[in-house]
């Protein structure tokens, strides 16, 4: 009677080459990527500080916006610093567990942002379609439960990815053709059947995100129906203006994500470096643009930022250090 011992081999490190085919341009690509990342972190940090400090912004809509800002910082910080280390310092190696952790947070932030956008759509639906019931429907306990549901759902959907990767033996190559780790890209290096990884990696998160998109579309169809029933044009314009920034953020999040998904599946003739370059831009550009969009289109945010900077200027002028 023979016994077969199957050993699951995990490499000590994976190698991230950056953007294959564009190695000669890494240093030039790093400059706009670094500027985008700095702008994203500063913009979202300012947004969070303003929402926390300004009492008139202590409402559910801006609470969800602050959650989105935190997710944006985490998403870009999970990926961009490592990419810059590859471009600048040739730091191509990443430990196996660190690679799995990075992939987990990348996917969790993506699913989490989708859920937050759904929560913000629900907030706008209640505010416009049932304004008299807004304060009774979206109480702070309810908002807290929604926030907890967003985090719990994101964690539970992506957590199995850790075990799906750790169960695989990697005995072929340890070179991940990317600048950061993501589930399917790492799973394809395994010398075993990855059917479960492919089905789970694509179907479960995508189904949840598509469900979010459908619910957001239903919310905004009901919002538009309610808006066009308003008696005056000024009332319609005011109602729509409260949704403008949210709609911009929704488009910036979902359009690139579905474009990337479709090109991965059907764009067989698109060079690999184009896919990876778009993936790097996707985790950096929307987080940079979100606070700018809300700052430009939302009067309360603009006034809050101006108020905070005025306070800083006043403190600098009256402080002994500034005199």
Curated annotation (Swiss-Prot):
Positions of glycan attachment: 5
Gene3D superfamilies: Rhodopsin 7-helix transmembrane proteins
Membrane topology of the entry: Multi-pass membrane protein
Xref: CDD domains: 7tmA_OR52B-like
Record bears the keyword Transmembrane helix: yes
InterPro entries linked: GPCR_Rhodpsn, GPCR_Rhodpsn_7TM, Olfact_rcpt, OR51/52/56-like
TM regions (residue ranges): 28-48, 57-77, 102-122, 142-162, 199-219, 240-260, 276-296
GO molecular function, one term: olfactory receptor activity
GO cellular component: plasma membrane
Subcellular location: Cell membrane
Cytoplasmic side: 49-56, 123-141, 220-239, 297-323
Disulfide-bonded cysteines: 99-191
Presence of keyword Ion transport: no
Keywords: Cell membrane, Disulfide bond, G-protein coupled receptor, Glycoprotein, Membrane, Olfaction, Receptor, Sensory transduction, Transducer, Transmembrane, Transmembrane helix
Record topological domains on the Extracellular side: 1-27, 78-101, 163-198, 261-275
Role: Odorant receptor.
Homology family: Belongs to the G-protein coupled receptor 1 family.
Name by which UniProt lists this protein: Olfactory receptor 52B2
């Amino acid at each position: 009677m023979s016994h077969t011992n199957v050993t699951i081999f995990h490499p000590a490190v994976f190698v991230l080459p950056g953007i294959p085919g564009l190695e000669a341009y890494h240093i030039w690509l790093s400059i706009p990527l670094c500027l985008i990342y700095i702008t994203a972190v500063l913009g979202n940090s300012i947004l969070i500080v303003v929402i926390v400090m300004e009492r008139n912004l202590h409402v559910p809509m801006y609470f969800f916006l602050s959650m989105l800002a935190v997710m944006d910082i985490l998403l870009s910080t999970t990926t961009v610093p490592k990419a810059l280390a590859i471009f600048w310092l040739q730091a191509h190696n990443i430990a196996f567990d660190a690679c799995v952790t990075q992939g987990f947070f990348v996917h969790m932030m993506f699913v989490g942002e989708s859920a937050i956008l759904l929560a913000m759509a629900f907030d706008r639906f209640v505010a416009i379609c049932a304004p008299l019931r807004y304060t009774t429907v979206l109480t702070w306990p309810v908002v807290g439960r929604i926030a907890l549901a967003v985090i719990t759902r994101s964690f539970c959907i992506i957590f199995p990815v850790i075990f799906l990767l750790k169960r695989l033996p990697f005995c072929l190559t340890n070179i991940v053709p990317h600048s950061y780790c993501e589930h399917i890209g790492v799973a394809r290096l395994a010398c075993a059947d990855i059917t479960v990884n492919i089905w789970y990696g694509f179907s479960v998160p995508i189904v949840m995100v598509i469900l979010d998109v459908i619910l957001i579309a239903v919310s905004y169809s009901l919002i538009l129906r309610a808006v066009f029933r308003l008696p005056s044009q000024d009332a319609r314009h005011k109602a729509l203006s409260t949704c403008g920034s949210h709609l911009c953020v929704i488009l910036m999040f979902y359009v690139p994500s579905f474009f990337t998904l479709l090109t991965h599946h059907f764009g067989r003739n698109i060079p690999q470096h184009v896919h990876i370059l778009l993936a790097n831009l996707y985790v950096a550009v929307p987080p940079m643009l979100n606070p700018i969009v809300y700052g430009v289109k939302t009067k309360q945010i603009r006034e809050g930022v101006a108020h905070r900077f005025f306070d800083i200027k006043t403190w600098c002028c009256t402080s002994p250090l500034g005199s």
